[in-house]
């Protein structure tokens, strides 16, 4: 809720309906919400990049479905997205934060108790909109894929398995790429990328190459100023769809 600087939680009733609306203050201009267990207590926590400031808010969940403890992670200017996974393979969740108006992403290593230590800023040569963490080169180590909003590119970084990343690769797409999805759209065993290009009103598909880079494949008309997408087998025909 950008105007009220809050997020809203609706509790599911199990029949498709929702009740009990809870609101939590998180900071100016919250951008999105990510969910994961950050402190290894078996309960999901919330991570919210605060686009209007230089921090990310973390709300820790309790056994009642509430979020009672709030902490601030100073994550750098205009945080736009947070990707969560165990990038250093120590069993604890780590964070990678993208920044809309600066040229680097920020890596935070988790201690397993909900606290994080900044490891490094990685220059990706442009402000970013969104991030995903996935093992795109199938070496058992997690990699990063993201969109460079103002530079009209997608970037990828290979992970070393210790929280570090190497070999920045980029691929040109349409204007103002924002949300991305990773999937094997052509069933060749390699990850491909779908990305919303807001200015061009298209979804661009990038095909995965044998060297685990990406090349432009095709554009599909998506309507006026598309802003987000997901990929899944929506109609259960065994083929990946995009919405």
Segments from the language model and where they lie:
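Blade-edge motifs of beta-propeller repeat domains
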Residues: 11-28, 60-77, 109-126, 158-175, ...
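Beta-propeller blade termini
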Residues: 11, 31-38, 60, 80-89, ...
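Low-complexity intrinsically disordered segments
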Residues: 5, 53-54, 68, 84, ...
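A short loop-to-beta-strand structural motif that recurs across blades of beta-propeller domains
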Residues: 6-9, 55-58, 104-107, 153-157, ...
């Amino acid at each position: 809720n950008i105007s009220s600087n809050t997020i809203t939680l609706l509790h599911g009733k199990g029949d498709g309906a929702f009740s009990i609306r809870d609101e939590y203050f998180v900071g100016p201009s919250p951008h999105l919400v990510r969910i994961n267990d950050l402190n290894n207590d078996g309960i999901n926590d919330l991570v919210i990049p605060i686009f209007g400031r230089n921090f990310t808010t973390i709300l820790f969940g309790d056994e009642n479905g509430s979020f009672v403890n709030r902490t601030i992670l100073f994550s750098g200017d205009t945080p736009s997205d947070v990707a969560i996974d165990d990038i250093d393979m120590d069993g604890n969740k780590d964070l990678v934060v993208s920044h809309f108006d600066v040229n680097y992403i920020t890596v935070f290593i988790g201690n397993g108790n909900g606290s994080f230590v900044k490891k490094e800023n990685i220059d990706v040569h442009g402000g970013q909109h969104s991030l995903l963490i996935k093992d795109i080169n199938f070496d058992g180590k997690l990699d990063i894929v993201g969109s460079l909003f103002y530079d009209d590119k997608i970037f990828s970084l290979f992970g070393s398995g210790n929280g570090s990343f190497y070999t920045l690769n980029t691929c040109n797409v349409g204007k103002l790429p924002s949300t991305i999805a990773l999937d094997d759209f052509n069933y060749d065993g390699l990850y491909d990328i779908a990305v919303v290009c807001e200015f061009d009103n298209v979804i661009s598909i990038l095909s995965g190459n044998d060297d685990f880079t990406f090349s432009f494949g095709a554009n599909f008309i998506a309507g006026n100023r598309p802003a987000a997408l997901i990929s899944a087998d929506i109609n259960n025909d065994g083929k990946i769809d995009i919405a």
